[in-house]
């Protein structure tokens, strides 16, 4: 078949490349809390390399920095602050718990 007469040709769309999360000037260090906190989930877990969109070497450095910051108590190991919302506080009723004799 002739190349000029292809029935299904897809047009090449241009796409914007995402900016890398770590710039070349950023230093991956346990003291750089603004950088480290971007790679931790709300539960306090280290996000995966696929989610972070970083290279393998950068992910290893981030992981080591996070673990060092946790050991030095700059970061919590778990971020499990459960927030319960109550619309109205109701007092406990003790009259329902009467013993029958």
UniProtKB/Swiss-Prot annotation:
PROSITE patterns: RIBOSOMAL_S18. Keywords: Chloroplast, Plastid, Ribonucleoprotein, Ribosomal protein, RNA-binding, rRNA-binding. Coiled coil: none annotated. Residues 1-19 have a biased composition (Basic residues). It is found in: Plastid, Chloroplast. The keyword Plastid applies. This is Small ribosomal subunit protein bS18c. One of its GO terms (biological process) is translation. It comes from Arabis hirsuta (Hairy rock-cress). PANTHER family: 30S RIBOSOMAL PROTEIN S18, SMALL RIBOSOMAL SUBUNIT PROTEIN BS18M. It comes from the Eukaryota. SUPFAM superfamilies: Ribosomal protein S18 (SSF46911). Part of the 30S ribosomal subunit. Belongs to the bacterial ribosomal protein bS18 family. Residues 1-20 are annotated as: Disordered. One of its GO terms (cellular component) is mitochondrial small ribosomal subunit. GO terms for molecular function: small ribosomal subunit rRNA binding; structural constituent of ribosome. Gene3D superfamilies: Ribosomal protein S18.
């Amino acid at each position: 078949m002739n190349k000029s007469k292809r029935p299904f040709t897809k047009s090449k769309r241009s796409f914007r490349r995402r900016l890398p999360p770590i710039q070349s000037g950023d230093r991956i260090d346990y003291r750089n809390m603004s950088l480290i906190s971007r790679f931790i989930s709300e539960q306090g877990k280290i996000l995966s390399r696929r989610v972070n969109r970083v290279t393998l070497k950068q992910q290893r450095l981030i992981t080591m920095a996070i673990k060092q910051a946790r050991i030095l108590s700059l970061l919590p190991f778990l971020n499990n602050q459960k927030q319960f919302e109550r619309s109205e506080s109701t007092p406990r009723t003790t009259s329902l718990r009467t013993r029958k004799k």
